[in-house]
């Protein structure tokens, strides 16, 4: 009797051990799946808290109708201006408030070259400012300005995509606007953006503060160095000043890598900063350079061939010709 009881106890213990081992195996499998999913879906390029969290890390392509409304343009060209070249009061469809804004040299001619039914040029209206925390300039902080611009760009694309699901997109940005457009392009290319990646015809970023060697198409002449946000990523004091330097974009541009162009001039410390370009010990100079100030005439000259040109074309003309070709060859969705 005692022998039977011992056998029974051993059997129960064996079952318990087997169950525990199965639980461990299941936990390992779950951990591996989570790790693999994490590798497939890198975190958003947009700083935390700027956009509401999506329902899933990456979404599949949305179903599309065969037709869209007759009021929908075939293409929407979204332009994100640089610091001090936009405001929330600006009319996105008629941006006359800042007549010297760099990207008007692209969107203006495009609007003249194509009918409104073919392309809508949309300039993101946001508080494009950069507060120097060592001064009393009453400007919005870079973090808040960038967040506002990102939300405005995502809202514009989301609205257009909801109303016109067959419309394609061309994205351009300059300086702070290049960071914003690049972040949104990164999210789109990695399956987290406001539209599906196959709807984006192309992206061009001029003087991108998150420019990184080997990521996107570096349009020659392309200098060495990387964006200031990468060079200064490890300087935590800047975050406390409203100047978070976000480092490389996780996942790069994903599926949009081959469709994303980076234009940067030699000597522009915003997009081509050598490793020792900024001195955290000399904070005033660093902040002034980030604001496009000291030693930065290069940053303001992309409409001229003086510091950057491709076969004599300045950055704005190169971007205009590139965009014109994309729009000319873009799909012609059916309308009802």
UniProtKB/Swiss-Prot annotation:
SMART domains: Cutinase. Its EC number is 3.1.1.-. Changing residue 175 to A: Loss of activity for both short- and long-chain substrates. It is a single-pass membrane protein. Optimum pH is above 7.0 for lipase activity. Inhibited by tetrahydrolipstatin (THL), a specific lipase inhibitor, and by derivatives of THL. Inhibited by high concentrations of paraoxon. Also inhibited by a Furan-based urea derivative, 1-(3,5-difluorophenyl)-3-(furan-2-ylmethyl)urea. Keywords: Cell membrane, Cell wall, Disulfide bond, Hydrolase, Membrane, Secreted, Serine esterase, Transmembrane, Transmembrane helix. GO terms for cellular component: extracellular region; peptidoglycan-based cell wall; plasma membrane. It holds the Pfam family Cutinase. It is found in: Cell membrane; Secreted, Cell wall. Residues 44-58 have a biased composition (Pro residues). Disulfide bonds join 72-164, 264-271. It comes from the Bacteria. The record marks 176 as: Transition state stabilizer. GO terms for biological process: lipid catabolic process. The active site is at residues 175, 268, 299. The essential nature of the cell wall protein Culp6 makes it a promising target for drug development. GO terms for molecular function: carboxylesterase activity; fatty acyl-CoA hydrolase activity; lipase activity; phospholipase A1 activity. Belongs to the cutinase family. Shows esterase and phospholipase A activities. May be involved in cell wall biosynthesis and/or maintenance. Can hydrolyze various substrates, including the p-nitrophenol-linked aliphatic esters pNP-laurate (C12), pNP-myristate (C14), pNP-palmitate (C16), pNP-stearate (C18), pNP-butyrate (C4), phosphatidylcholine, phosphatidylethanolamine, phosphatidylserine, 4-methylumbelliferyl heptanoate and palmitic acid and arachidonic acid containing phospholipids. Does not exhibit cutinase activity. This is Carboxylesterase/lipase Culp6. It comes from Mycobacterium tuberculosis (strain ATCC 25618 / H37Rv). The gene is cut6.
């Amino acid at each position: 009797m005692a022998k039977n009881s011992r056998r029974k106890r051993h059997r129960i213990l064996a079952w318990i051990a087997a169950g525990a081992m199965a639980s461990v195996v299941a936990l390992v499998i779950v951990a591996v799946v989570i790790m693999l999913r994490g590798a497939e879906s890198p975190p958003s390029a947009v700083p935390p808290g700027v956009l509401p969290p999506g329902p899933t890390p990456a979404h599949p392509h949305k179903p599309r109708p065969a037709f869209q409304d007759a009021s929908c343009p075939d293409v929407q060209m979204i332009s994100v201006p640089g610091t001090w070249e936009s405001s929330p009061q600006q009319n996105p469809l008629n941006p006359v408030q800042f007549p010297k804004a760099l990207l008007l040299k692209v969107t203006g001619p495009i609007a003249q070259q194509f009918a409104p039914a073919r392309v809508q040029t949309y300039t993101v209206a946001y508080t494009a400012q950069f507060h120097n925390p060592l001064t009393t300039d009453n400007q919005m902080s870079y973090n808040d300005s960038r967040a506002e611009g990102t939300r405005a760009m995502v809202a514009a694309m989301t609205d257009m995509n909801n109303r016109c699901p067959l419309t394609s997109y061309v994205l351009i940005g300059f300086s702070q606007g290049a960071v914003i457009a690049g972040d949104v392009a990164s999210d789109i290319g990695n399956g987290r953006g406001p539209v599906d990646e196959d709807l984006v015809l192309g992206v061009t970023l001029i003087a991108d503060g998150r420019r990184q060697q080997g990521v996107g198409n570096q349009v020659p002449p392309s200098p060495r160095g990387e964006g200031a946000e990468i060079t200064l990523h490890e300087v935590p004091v800047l975050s406390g000043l409203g100047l978070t330097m976000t480092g490389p974009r996780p996942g790069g541009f994903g599926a949009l890598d081959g469709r994303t162009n980076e234009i940067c001039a030699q000597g522009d410390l915003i997009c081509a900063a050598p490793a020792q370009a900024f001195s955290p010990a000399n904070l005033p100079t660093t902040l002034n350079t980030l604001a496009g100030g000291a030693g930065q005439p290069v940053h303001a000259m992309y409409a001229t061939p003086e510091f950057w040109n491709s076969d004599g074309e300045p950055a704005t003309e190169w971007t205009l010709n590139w965009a014109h070709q994309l729009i000319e060859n873009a799909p012609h969705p059916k309308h009802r």
